[in-house]
Structures are given as structure tokens and as C-alpha cells.
Amino acid sequence: MADDGMLMNFEIGEVPIVTKQSFKGGRWKDRLAAKKTAQHRVSRSTSKPSTREIFSERQHDTGAEEYIGREPSLRAPKRQRVDDNYDSYGGRNESTAAYASGKLPSGSINLGRGRKTTFQEETRPAFVAGKLPPGSINISGKKATPIQEETRPAFVSGKLPPGSINSGARKAISFQEEKKPAYISGKLPHGSIDGMRNREMAAVHREIAEGGRKPGQVVSSLFTFNPTSKKKFDEPEEESEPAKPSNAPLTEEMATFTNLGLSRRLAAHLSTKLDMKAPTAIQKASVTQLISDDSDAFIQAETGSGKTLAYLLPIVERILALSDNGIQIHRDSGLFAIILSPTRELCKQIAAVLEKVLRCAPWIVGTTVNGGESKQSEKARLRKGVNILVATPGRLADHLDNTEVLNVATVRWLVLDEGDRLMELGFEEEIKGIVEKIGRRSVASGSSEMMSLPKRRVTILCSATMKMNVQRLGEISLKDAVHIQADPSEQEKQDKANGIEADDKAFSAPTQLKQSYAIVPAKLRLVTLTALLKRAFARKGSVMKAIVFMSCADSVDFHFSLFSRSAEKSAEASEEGKVDPPTLPKSELIKETITHGATISNNSNPVILHKLHGSLAQNIRTATLKAYSESADPCVLICTDVASRGLDLPNVDFVIEYDPPFSAEDHLHRVGRTARAGREGRALIFLMPGTEEEYVSILASGYREGRKALTHHTAEDLIQKGFGGTGREWEERATNFQLEVERWSLDSPRYLEMARRGFQSHIRAYATHVANERHIFNMQELHLGHLAKAFALRDKPGSIKVPGLRPAKMTKADRSVAARKAKRGEKEEEKAPEGERVRKQRKMELDLPTVDSNEVAARMKRKMKEHMSAASEFNIG
């Protein structure tokens, strides 16, 4: 080529000009890692003969041509032109070679001296092969290409399981050996671990291929990149003989109600009408003390041992004694006893027990006053007269201040049930005021007619977890109190004889309770809970009733909707057949809180699902609890801690603590819903690998045998038993269930909103554990991405934002409108409930002036046209 004689003030070197690699997309850490990996491959590829000899020789052998110009120096030799297709890895691709020579076959390059070098297929870099799938690393705006199967890195092939390092357009990156993994080759036998991974990944990739993943979402694998347990737990020893129940009624030979000092009328009523043949140990100790003595008392006993009757029977017996003395007692004879309970549910339950006891003496009247009910109707009942009053502290304090008909001058008993819970809920000031007002208004009993009643007000404090060193509540209410507890067991007597003192800090659980714990990674929580419930209700009659405790109301709502999905939409419906729904109670109140649990039911054993939390209206909570207690079909109650205190729910066989309790005392009350009155029961708590495993030692402190009384489970064991199948088919079934739930959540804005609210509320609740347990439940240890998968979410945790607060409670008017729509056959909108902030914003926007958007757009268009038009005589200033 002849020299054109152009003078240049710069010199171009001999090194070929190559395109600069530009890594785009993904996080900067992923781009940096990919860049370093590419550079490493360059250094390896240039060391091979097939690529090294491309640059080992001069690209041009032409000599220095004669230079005509001002400078005496020779012009630099010409370099061969290299277009954008020239690769920095030491060669061109097929299209470049063909462009240069026009005659060479695909894969060869003309080096300028007649030599022809062909790339080896095994060593060609990925960016030369031109076969990478869309979404891999983008270089210089060109489409990237994959390497051959045998040698291409895992991060290029794009077949690593989701959950590894994410790069570019969310293709997984993992720096592995350049050999194709076994689970990609697909040649492993069925049932092996890698074969299972292949099937699981096939399900995930099939979900992506079918359009199940939307932009900004992540479909991750269930069984990869899960943290493992850091501690090794010993297997419990098999019991040689079953444990003796610690809260069972005594035998008739040991004690009867008549031997405790109760009248024949009351003792016969208990044995015939209430089917109570003998008292429990705590009832034996408290009834004799409270009948014969007028001292304050502190009753301490484990949960489910009958504390309610322990204080009700002495009160009723001493009031009945007035009638035996010839005094006619009726409802306006005066208020003799006030019983305070921390929650409305416990208040209703105490009133129900009292009503059964008073059937033998219908002239003694008891009633309740608590929040959530009409004050006018309560005032009407108080005006007629009442002898025993069961109340919550807040409502009783309100009536003492504002209701003149409430006369407390004749009060002789003040009972504080669940005293520790009263203090935890912040009722200290109310209790102080109640005690002071009753003390000022009470009159000493000096009449000979009232000899059977205490001469002074007796205060009784009851709790399962109350410690002897609790002083605040004792200073408020108790004076020279007597400590009443059940007779110590033989083991405790032996320990005391040997000089071993009991640990005051340890809480007490019934000995017949079978407690276990499961170490479950965050990603597997949902499928493990599902498998556990499926296994529990697999056979009819194996489990009648179960309770699942969760930390917040939003989580309860989400899981209630999830487990009550229609059976036709279930992936297993085609295999197991259609499940016949059980008969549900017909009531408008409980229409939203009771449904058929299609997800955990089967043909032979349909399950009824209930939900309960504090955000429900009081009448709905009461009706739901009543339906759950009276149901003869298998039931599951999903609830918060509102159902953990004092409620006597019959035939509860299994308690699942899906979210750990906020304190050890809360754990005791939760598991106390089962194994009551000498019956057997099971309890299982979910813990995550890591710091939460330290909670096992706290659980063990509630048992005399320590960790020997606890059973350890893994998530894999529970999932395998729940989903079944041959080999490792259970993992594929669990993966399909998880993907199905995620699709169900994404298909409905309502359910997606519920999942997001449940996720956020769960994280907020996780941060509220008591101070001395926060090192165990550490917020910094939570993997939010894995936890989001347990709520069927595919969003990144940082993008999960729910505006506003929880939806407002449904009023009577709202329920009436919903009932009318249901009668007309109108379906509810698939719309997420609005938060408080959204409603306020909408209210504010009502005051803004209305603006026509079309007019604004037209005005803006005219303004832009005016500024962009050419100069004319009309717009030149």
C-alpha cells in the first residue's frame, strides 16, 4: 500500500489494537470477580501453542518503506488492521478470519506468512466460541458466548444452583473447577444426592423457563447454601418406663373433695356433674389452707394443674356456708369476690368454670366485665347485683371511677390470676388503684351472721412462673402471704435431704410432656411446617387438635390463608384426589377465622383451620375459641400468644412453636396448653442454626433430666416424613410445593401484600426478645433473603416495602356490607388492604383542586414546541 504522505504528530506502536473489555450488569464485586477470572484465563490460554504462536511472530514482515518528509527518521512500520472482532485473548473468532482472507475455513486464521493456525475446540475461550446464553457477562456491548461443556467455567455455563454469587443478569457465579459438575451431566443414578440436585434444579429452571420469575425477582433453591448446625446434640435415652404425670388428679385413696373440707353438696356436684373424682395436688394444698385461714396466699404450681379451681372452690364453699347458717343469699347481698385476669379470653374461661361450679347454688350470681363489650350492658348487670365478679384490670378500674352502682364495701377476696402476666402487660398502675379503692371502701366484717366469711380482705396471687423474689406485685397487694405449692415429689424430697437446693430460675414443665426441638434453616421453615402438619394429621385419630404459635398477627393471617388454599389449586390434588371438606359451623362472626385446611388435609382426615390474634374483634375471638374447643373434628389453631395464657383448651395433643417465644416463661405457658390434668402431650419448637441453638440449654432447664428429656430433629427428617416418596423424591416434592406457593402469592395482590406484611412484622417481632436472650436471637445473624423465601417471596429483602400500618378492624357496618355482597353472589376484590398511611394520604388528596391531565399535557407540549422551534419574527426578542 502506497504511502499517502500524511504527516502525523503521534506514533502508533506495533501492538495490535484490541477492544477493551467492559463488564456490565450485576454488583461491582461480581464484575470484579468475573474480570479477574477472565484475566486468569488469558494468561493460561496464551501459554498454549495454539494461541501463543499468534502473537509470537511479527504480524507484518514488510521492511521499512522509504519515508519522504521533513524529519530524517523512518516512519514506523505499518500494522495490520484489526477490527472490533479481534479478541484480547489472542486471536479472532471465525467471522474475523473469514473476513480477513475470504477463503479460510471456520476456525482458522491467516498469520501473514502462509501459515494457518486453527483453534482447538477444547481451548477456545468462551468469548470466541460465541455460544453463551443471553444474560451472561456482557463485553463491550457484544453478546457473550459460552465455552464448550468440558472446559467452560461454572459461572459461564450458568448452571450453578440459585443461591450462589449473583452476577450480571442474575446468572449464578461460582469459581469451580473447569469440569462439568455431576448434577449437570445428568448421568447419576436415581436417588443419589447429585441426582436429587439435578431434579431440584430442573424444577427451578422449569419455573424460570415458564415465565414464573418476573424482573427483580429471585427463584432460589431450597436445599442449597443452607447453614448447618454448629453443635452436636446427643440423642435422648429411651425411657425404661413412662414418666409419672406431675399435674394429674390424686387417687381416691389419697384424697377426696370431702376430705378437703368441702360440703357434701359441692363435693357431690363435682363428682357427678363435673366428673371430678379427686383433686390435684395443688387443689389439695390450697383448698384446706384457704378454707381454714384468712391470710393472704401465693399459689404457685405448674401449668395445667388446676389453679382456677384451687381458689374458686374455697370462695364458693365459704359463701355456701352462709346459706347453711340460715342466711338467705341472693344477687344483691353484696359483692364478695373480685377475680382479675390479664386477658379477655382468660376472663371468659374463668367465668365459664365458675358458672359450672355455681350450678349447685343458683342463688349465687357471677358475671364478667372486660374490654370489648358494651359498658351499658355491664352497668345494667352490676345494677341488678352480683356476688362474684371476674374482670380485666382496665375495665374494672374504669367502673370503679365512673360506675356508682359498683359497691366494693363487702369484698372479701381479691384474686390476681396470672400475676406475672398482669405486670408484663403494664397493669401495675391499675392494680395499685384497684387495691387502694377497695381498701378505702371496704368495711370490716363484724357481724356474727357473716362468720363464715373472712374478717379482712384476703388477696390471692396465682401464677405458674411467679418467683418467690418478685417484690413489686407483693408489695402492692400481699401482706404476710402464705406460700402454697403442691407436695414435692419423691425426687425433690431426696434432693432436699441431700442438701441440693432447687433452682429458682428454672421454670417447671409437666413431666409427661414430650418436648422436642428442630434445627431448621430459614429457607426450609415453610416446607418443614407443612410437612410436620401433614405428618401429624396423616392418620385419622392420631392427633385431634394442634396449636401453632407465631410471633405476630400478620404472620398468622398469611399462614392461615396459605394453608386454606383451595384443593383444586394444590399440586397434590391430582395425585391424592379431591378432599371432602368437613362441616364448618355456620356463623357470620367466624366466617373469616374458620375454614377448611385443604393443604394439610387428606381424603381420610379433613382438618379444620382456625386463626386467633389480638387484632380481631372480641366477639370474633370468643366465638372462634368456642368453636375450636367444642369441635369434634381434627383442628389446627394458628395464633399468637393471646392464646398462650391460662386457656384450658380440651384435647390439645400437639403444640408447635413456629416462632420462638419472647421469654422462657412464655414458652412454659405455650406448651402448657397440652399435657394438662395428667394427660399426655407433645411440643416442638423451631430453631435456626447458629446462635439460636443455645436456646436448647434454656429448654433443658425446665426438666429435671435436662437435655435427656429433649428430642432433637432435623429439617430433612421432618420433610422426608411429611412429603414421603421413594429415595430422595421428598426433596423434589418439597421444591414443587414451595414453587407452587410462590406462584400463588405472586398471582394475587392481596396474598402478596399479606406475605410482605408477615415478613416485615416477623422481623420487627424478632427484635423484641427479652434482654437476657437477645444474644441468642440476634438480629445480625438473620439471613433476610432466606427468611423471605419462608414467606413465599421472590423479592429482594431491601425492596419489600409495605406502606401504612395494619388494616383497620372490620366494623359491624363493614361486616353487614360483606354479608349482603355474599348473598348477591358478588366476589371480593383481589386487592391488598390499605394501610393507615395510604388512607390518610387519600383523605388529604380530596382537598386538592382537580386538574385535567389532558389539559396539562397539551399546555406542556405547546411550551416545548415554542422553545424548540426555529427563530422567527414572532419569537425573536
UniProtKB/Swiss-Prot annotation:
- The UniProt record lists the Helicase C-terminal domain at 512-719
How does the record comment on the protein's domains?
A: The Q motif is unique to and characteristic of the DEAD box family of RNA helicases and controls ATP binding and hydrolysis.
Q: Where does ATP bind?
A: 301-308
Belongs to which family? Answer: Belongs to the DEAD box helicase family. DDX31/DBP7 subfamily.
Its subcellular locations are:
Nucleus, Nucleolus
- Substrates-to-products reaction catalysed: ATP + H2O = ADP + phosphate + H(+)
Biological process (GO) annotations?
endonucleolytic cleavage in ITS1 upstream of 5.8S rRNA from tricistronic rRNA transcript (SSU-rRNA, 5.8S rRNA, LSU-rRNA); ribosome biogenesis
Q: Give the EC number(s) under which this enzyme is classified.
A: 3.6.4.13
Query: Which Pfam families has this protein been placed in?
Result: CTE_SPB4, DEAD, Helicase_C
Q: Where is the Helicase ATP-binding domain?
A: 288-484
Main localization is: nucleus
State the protein's name.
Answer: ATP-dependent RNA helicase dbp7
Q: Name one GO cellular component term.
A: nucleus
What the protein does comes down to:
ATP-binding RNA helicase involved in the biogenesis of 60S ribosomal subunits and is required for the normal formation of 25S and 5.8S rRNAs.
Question: Which organism is this protein's natural source?
Answer: Sclerotinia sclerotiorum (strain ATCC 18683 / 1980 / Ss-1) (White mold)
Keywords from UniProt, A to Z, are:
ATP-binding, Helicase, Hydrolase, Nucleotide-binding, Nucleus, Ribosome biogenesis, RNA-binding, rRNA processing
List the ranges annotated as motif Q motif: 255-284
- Per UniProt, the ranges with Basic and acidic residues bias are 50-73, 825-846
Motif DEAD box: where in chain: 417-420
SUPFAM superfamilies membership: P-loop containing nucleoside triphosphate hydrolases
GO MF terms listed in the record are: ATP binding; ATP hydrolysis activity; RNA binding; RNA helicase activity
Which InterPro entries does this chain map to? DEAD/DEAH_box_helicase_dom, Helicase_ATP-bd, Helicase_C-like, P-loop_NTPase, SPB4-like_CTE
Positions of the UniProt region annotated as Disordered: 34-163, 225-251, 803-851
Does the keyword section mention Nucleotide-binding?
yes
